[in-house]
C-alpha cells in the first residue's frame, strides 16, 4: 500500500460518518400544568423526557428535561401520587406533554383514590 493511500485511509477513518446535531427539548422543573421552554441539549443527550405527577385528579405538576437515557413509566397504583413518564427523540417533541388520552392519564389517580377509601 502506498504511503499516500495509507494516509488517506487514516484520515477517512477519523472523520465522523454524519455530523452530530444536538437535540432541542422543552426544559422545566415542576411547572403547574405544562411548559414551553425550548433548550439545546448537550450532545450526548438522546431523549426529551416529560414526567407528570398527579396529586389529585385536578392538581398535577409537569417536569420536562433532556436525558441521556429514558424509561417510559405508567403509574403502578402502589404509591401515594400518580406519576407517568414519556420519552421521545426529535426536536421539541415534548411540547404537548404525555401523548396519552386524559381519561387514561387520570385512571390511576381515580384508582388510587378509590383504593385509599377502602
From Swiss-Prot:
Q: How does the protein associate with the membrane?
A: Lipid-anchor; GPI-anchor
Instruction: Give the GO biological process terms.
Output: acetylcholine receptor signaling pathway; regulation of neurotransmitter receptor activity
* InterPro entries, alphabetized: Ly-6/neurotoxin-like_GPI-ap, LY6_UPA_recep-like, Snake_toxin-like_sf, Toxin/TOLIP
Point out the propeptide residues: 96-118
Q: Name one GO molecular function term.
A: acetylcholine receptor regulator activity
Q: Where in the cell is it found?
A: Cell membrane; Cell projection, Dendrite; Endoplasmic reticulum
User: Which chain regions cross the lipid bilayer?
Assistant: none
Q: Identify where the record puts lipid attachment of type GPI-anchor amidated serine.
A: 95
Tell what triggers its expression. Up-regulated by prenatal nicotine exposure.
Which keywords label this protein?
Cell membrane, Cell projection, Disulfide bond, Endoplasmic reticulum, Glycoprotein, GPI-anchor, Lipoprotein, Membrane, Signal
Cystine bridges: 25-48, 28-35, 41-66, 70-87, 88-93
**This protein's GO CC annotations:** dendrite; endoplasmic reticulum; plasma membrane; side of membrane; synapse
Q: In which tissues is it expressed?
A: Expressed in lung predominantly in airway epithelial cells, submucous glands, and smooth muscle cells, in endothelial and smooth muscle cells in vessel walls and in alveolar type II cells (at protein level). Also expressed in brain.
Give all residue intervals belonging to the UPAR/Ly6 domain.
Answer: 23-107
- Signal sequence span is 1-22
Cite the record's note on assembly.
Interacts with nAChRs containing alpha-4:beta-2 (CHRNA4:CHRNB2) and alpha-7 (CHRNA7) subunits. Interacts with CHRNA4 probably in the endoplasmic reticulum prior to nAChR pentameric assembly. Interacts with KCNA2/Potassium voltage-gated channel subfamily A member 2.
Task: Please give the PANTHER family that the UniProt record associates with this protein.
Answer: LY-6_NEUROTOXIN-LIKE PROTEIN 1, UPAR/LY6 DOMAIN-CONTAINING PROTEIN
State what this protein does: Acts in different tissues through interaction to nicotinic acetylcholine receptors (nAChRs). The proposed role as modulator of nAChR activity seems to be dependent on the nAChR subtype and stoichiometry, and to involve an effect on nAChR trafficking and its cell surface expression, and on single channel properties of the nAChR inserted in the plasma membrane. Modulates functional properties of nicotinic acetylcholine receptors (nAChRs) to prevent excessive excitation, and hence neurodegeneration.
What is the official name of this protein in its record? Ly-6/neurotoxin-like protein 1
Question: What taxonomic lineage is listed for the species of origin?
Answer: Eukaryota, Metazoa, Chordata, Craniata, Vertebrata
Amino acid at each position: 500500500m502506498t504511503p499516500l493511500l495509507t494516509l488517506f485511509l487514516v484520515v477517512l477513518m477519523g472523520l465522523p460518518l454524519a455530523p452530530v446535531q444536538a437535540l432541542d427539548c422543552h426544559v422545566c422543573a415542576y411547572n403547574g400544568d405544562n411548559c414551553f421552554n425550548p433548550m439545546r441539549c448537550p450532545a450526548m443527550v438522546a431523549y426529551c423526557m416529560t414526567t407528570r405527577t398527579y396529586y389529585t385528579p385536578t392538581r398535577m405538576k409537569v417536569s420536562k428535561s433532556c436525558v441521556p437515557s429514558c424509561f417510559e413509566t405508567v403509574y403502578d397504583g402502589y404509591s401515594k401520587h400518580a406519576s407517568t413518564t414519556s420519552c421521545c427523540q426529535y426536536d421539541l417533541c415534548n411540547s404537548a406533554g404525555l401523548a396519552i388520552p386524559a381519561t387514561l392519564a387520570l385512571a390511576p389517580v381515580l384508582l388510587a383514590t378509590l383504593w385509599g377509601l377502602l
